[in-house]
Amino acid sequence: MSRRHRAEKREINPDPKFGDTVVTKFMNAIMFEGKKSVAERIVYGALDQVQEKTKQEPVAVFHQALDNVAPHVEVRSRRVGGATYQVPVDVRPERRQALAIRWLISAARGRNEKTMVERLSGELLDASSNRGTAVKKREDTHKMAEANRAFSHYRW
């Protein structure tokens, strides 16, 4: 299914409260079945809780959490001869952000606080201080890449 042209990037509007496009992307990733207002309530509620607990700017804590979760290298499968090698490759900036958002949300959903607002704020606080499930996921990804460094010459 090749395309004649590369699909152009869509313009993402900044969110109304903080004026940040990354917060909008995060909201869109949390959203189920097009329920944007529910996603907004969850994200803004979590950021308000973060502000109450840390007494810091919530968007700064959010960005710190994303930076701490975003992977620098990952492994990709590459077939050479009859063998499949896990080849470490650098992660593009857009993919870094997308993976960080995805991992933060899945880690928050896996927590066992009562509401999603509490789960998300807890995971954001953990990730901003280099703890939590999402940060562990990044560490595991980096370990895999380090373990397979011998195959880095198979890069493409």
Curated annotation (Swiss-Prot):
GO terms for biological process: translation. It holds the Pfam family Ribosomal_S7. One of its GO terms (molecular function) is rRNA binding. Disulfide bonds: none annotated. The keyword Mitochondrion does not apply. The keyword RNA-binding applies. One of the primary rRNA binding proteins, it binds directly to 16S rRNA where it nucleates assembly of the head domain of the 30S subunit. Is located at the subunit interface close to the decoding center, probably blocks exit of the E-site tRNA. Belongs to the universal ribosomal protein uS7 family. Part of the 30S ribosomal subunit. Contacts proteins S9 and S11. This is Small ribosomal subunit protein uS7.
